[in-house]
Swiss-Prot record:
Belongs to the CoaE family. Signal peptide: none annotated. Pathway: Cofactor biosynthesis; coenzyme A biosynthesis; CoA from (R)-pantothenate: step 5/5. ATP binds at A37, S38, G39, K40, S41, T42. Keywords: ATP-binding, Coenzyme A biosynthesis, Cytoplasm, Kinase, Nucleotide-binding, Transferase. The gene is coaE. It catalyses: 3'-dephospho-CoA + ATP = ADP + CoA + H(+). The keyword Iron-sulfur does not apply. This is Dephospho-CoA kinase.
Length: 231
């Protein structure tokens, strides 16, 4: 088992061990993931504030289907012009209602979006790895588990919260029904599947003001592993 639970001191693997820095050369590549509304964006922001280079796959997935892109043209070809709003931009709500209810539709969308996002992410990753000094590159990937990418990273960090709290957050954030929130959760990998690939588990059920303590602890261990690897 490869796990460090930062939230409650349960540790089965020490983050500061040198074998966490598989990439060597002064770079640690972190795969950050978790279910919908599990706090990934908050954790990603906090890691960025501590010096990590953040590659936000959600943002990239929006960029590659912006107005005028080939990605948007492919989406319209696959799903029709009803997924556009009046100004020609993507109607994410309309598209979401299609793909969350239909596995085959979701796979068609992923086949369009994922290669474009991967190309963009690779460019950012290469630029970060070419920089001088010690670098932590965080790939914030909502579908890391679903796409089987855990082994690509030196550290896999999972944001974890009870599913009932996920539902509450989704309903509050998006104004959808509980049924819709549950459908979105069930469309992703399960909580157990996320935890199974985790090297580090961040407990995001804690009050927001308590979360930086967890981030500081894992950041110091990853940074310590980097320094150890450089000696």
């Amino acid at each position: 088992m490869r796990r460090t639970v930062i939230g409650d001191e349960t540790t089965a693997r020490d983050v500061a061990r040198a074998d966490w820095v598989a990439g060597a050369g002064g770079v640690v590549r972190v795969g950050l993931t978790g279910g919908i509304a599990s706090g990934k964006s908050t954790v990603s922001q906090m890691l960025g504030e501590r010096g990590a280079v953040i590659i936000d796959y959600d943002r990239l997935s929006r960029d590659v289907v912006a107005v005028g892109t080939q990605g948007l043209a492919q989406v319209v070809e696959a799903f029709g012009r009803e997924v556009l709003v009046a100004d020609g931009s993507l109607n994410r709500s309309a598209l979401g209602s299609i793909v969350f209810a239909d596995l085959q539709a979701r796979r068609r969308l992923e086949a369009i979006i994922h290669p474009l996002v991967e190309e963009a992410a690779h460019r950012v990753d290469e630029e970060a790895r070419a920089a001088d000094g010690l670098v932590v590159v965080v790939h914030d990937i909502p579908l890391l588990v679903e796409t089987g990418r855990a082994d690509e990273f030196d550290v896999v960090m999972v944001t974890d919260v009870d599913p009932a709290e996920q539902v509450r957050r989704v309903v509050e954030r998006d104004g959808c029904s509980q049924a819709d929130a549950w459908a979105r959760i069930h469309a992703q990998a399960s909580r157990e599947e996320h935890l199974a690939v985790a090297d580090v588990i961040i407990d995001t059920s804690v009050p927001l003001e308590d979360l930086p303590e967890q981030i500081d602890r894992v950041w110091s261990r990853i940074a310590g592993a980097l320094r150890f690897d450089r000696r």
